[in-house]
Amino acid sequence: MKLPFKTQASLIVCAMLVLPLAQAATISKADYQAGKTRISDTYKTERSACATFAANARDICIEESSAKQKVARAELEHSYTAKPKDLSKVGVAKADAVYAVAKERCDDKAGNDKSVCVKETKAIHVKALADVKMGRQIGEAKTDAATDKRDADYQVAAQKCDALQGDAKNNCMSAAKARFGKV
């Protein structure tokens, strides 16, 4: 069954945005270097396979192999560092990859069909980038909320400790500081 371009692109973007939000376990430096080499070798192999195609099909093939390489590098970087910032970069790389390939596919069309295709592709790209940005902002908001909750809980504990005197108060404050990360 052949789906219209807009439906295909929407499905790709939806699939792309289902990113694991949990922090991944990091990989060793040796695995990271091996991954970089593997990605580079895979890219060279896929790129050379594109020579069998002609005209825009070759351009699409080259763009797909380049897109796969960029996404793989971003995912590898996230696997190595496990930073939320790198997870965001994975989302951006995927959005950019889908956009670049879809834009290249639009070159097969002509006239108004091509213009519509390019506009739809650009709109999908902008939406995907907005979703990545929103995910990043939600993560930051959760972090801020957790910090606010921890600070509020610390103030409550400190207030309870104020009712004590002497060593009991000092021990209580030390325990509260340790518990709520105020060391």
Predicted segments with their positions:
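Repetitive helical segments and hydrophobic/amphipathic motifs
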Residues: 15-17
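Mitochondrial intermembrane space
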Residues: 3-4, 23-183
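Bacterial N-terminal signal peptides that target proteins for export
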Residues: 1-11
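N-terminal signal peptide c-region/cleavage motif recognized by signal peptidases
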Residues: 19-21
